[in-house]
């Protein structure tokens, strides 16, 4: 890892506070534009709420660890940086509130219709694992529904003014459908309806997470272990861990306290052992999370682990939105191939 920005991303992106595992060099006052790039890159990683809060903490308590230069130049630069950071954070929170309100309306109508549906990822993770909507960025509403109830949910969405966006032919076999609606203040609202969180058929042969598996009454319904499986499968199969947020989701859920036996059972049922191992290992390596490390150890032996840890490194994840990201794509595709070899249900 060569970019100072990446070190500060890792240092400032833990919602629980400053990450002591990373002590990057400060920026000289002439490098202040790079701190604006840091805010933008945090936005692309969807970790800006934590970064802005921790940035403020550093600038108040130890500004010389972040910026060096004459005090009369640093003070106005700090003020401008914090003003932009707080403005961006306010926009992130405002959109999260709009999306959460949309999700609540949808879930109320779905419940009245008796539909088997669960709110997943975004607003659910924010409220269940992050401590509130202000602590996690998300850009849409995600609903997981039993396949045979999808048409009825479509009727609910259409009744609220949402329009179905037909997928391109090459994506017709995916288990995700998009619905959109214009909002007077928040642009376009996107709702993604999933019948299986593993969207592509080539990966779905090896792993799967349906509504009934996620919200299994025999395992206590939607538990922290269920959310951790959700976070790992989503980060791995949909995005190949191309944002820090997918690691932080696992980090925050692991901190809730996880029943290791339940986690192992759910991982086997869904085929998620390798994605889960990747998520936990990265949370331990990047953020030093002991809970993640302990859970990772309970999964051993992990199929293809020696190959996996060399492909999906901490540096790869932290660099995934930087200027060299295109050079990293071949390694991500290798990881995707590995997911098809490591059938966790075997």
Each language-model region and where it sits:
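Conserved NTP-donor binding/palm subdomain of two-metal-ion nucleotidyltransferases/polymerases, i.e.
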Residues: 1-139, 145-346
């Amino acid at each position: 890892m060569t970019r100072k920005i990446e070190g500060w991303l890792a240092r400032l992106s833990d919602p629980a506070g400053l990450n002591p595992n990373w002590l990057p060099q400060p920026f000289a006052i002439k490098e202040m534009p790079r701190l604006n790039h840091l805010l933008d890159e945090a936005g692309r990683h969807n970790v800006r709420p934590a970064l802005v809060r921790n940035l403020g903490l550093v600038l108040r308590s130890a500004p010389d660890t972040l910026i060096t230069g004459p005090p009369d130049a640093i003070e106005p630069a700090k003020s401008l940086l914090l003003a932009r950071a707080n403005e961006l954070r306010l926009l992130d929170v405002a959109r999260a509130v709009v999306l959460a309100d949309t999700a609540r309306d949808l879930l109320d109508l779905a419940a009245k219709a008796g539909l088997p549906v669960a709110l997943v990822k975004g607003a659910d993770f924010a409220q269940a694992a992050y401590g509130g909507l202000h602590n996690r960025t998300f850009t849409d509403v995600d609903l997981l529904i039993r396949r045979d109830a999808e048409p009825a949910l479509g009727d609910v969405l259409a009744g609220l003014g949402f329009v179905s966006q037909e997928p391109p032919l090459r994506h017709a076999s995916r288990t995700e459908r998009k619905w959109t609606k214009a909002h007077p203040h928040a642009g376009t609202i996107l709702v993604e309806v999933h019948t299986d969180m593993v969207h592509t058929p080539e990966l779905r042969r090896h792993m799967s997470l349906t509504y009934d598996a996620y919200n299994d009454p025999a395992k206590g319904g939607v538990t922290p272990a269920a959310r951790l499986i959700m976070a790992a499968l989503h980060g791995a199969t949909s995005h190949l861990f191309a944002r820090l947020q997918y690691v932080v989701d696992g980090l925050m859920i692991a901190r809730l306290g996880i029943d290791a036996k339940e986690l192992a059972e759910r991982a086997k049922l869904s085929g998620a052992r390798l994605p889960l191992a990747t998520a936990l290992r990265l949370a331990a390596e990047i953020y030093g999370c002991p809970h993640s490390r302990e859970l990772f150890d309970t999964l051993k032996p992990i199929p293809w682990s020696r190959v996996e840890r060399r492909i999906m490194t901490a540096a790869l994840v932290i660099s995934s939105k930087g200027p060299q990201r295109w050079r990293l794509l071949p390694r991500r595709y290798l990881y995707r191939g590995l997911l098809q070899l490591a059938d966790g249900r075997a």
